[in-house]
């Protein structure tokens, strides 16, 4: 099984699939904001940034998946984005499951001064005046943070499997002059 995932990680199509799934999640977030009129909170903006990290990881991995450094850079970005996004989604769910005055998110995103994403791309990363503990949308009884917990858990699980497969030896390629 690990050899299958090792071969998959050496294939450009798998990395483009990761980028496509992340792009689809970003596109659905934009649809929720502009199509359905749901205003994103600060945690939603952070979760969007984690999904954007997954998109970048897929594109970096698709550049040259057989090159060791490119593949490992993409894997590190994938792992960081998946686990950070999972932690953010769990915290967002905690805000909604246990609302209280002392357990609230910030009003303004706290990006580093060198990368103010909310100023560079305000149409995507600028939050609206909404509290993170408000449930704005549900599907099958699950809110947006619960669906993101599921999505980031799948991303994290796949990352762990692909990471473990990197330590699997590749099949030796016997080359013969007389073949």
Curated annotation (Swiss-Prot):
One of its GO terms (biological process) is protein folding. It is a multi-pass membrane protein. The chain crosses the membrane at residues 15-31, 50-65, 73-90, 147-165. One of its GO terms (cellular component) is plasma membrane. The keyword Ligase does not apply. Its main location: membrane. This is Disulfide bond formation protein B. The lineage of its organism: Bacteria, Pseudomonadati, Pseudomonadota, Gammaproteobacteria, Pasteurellales.
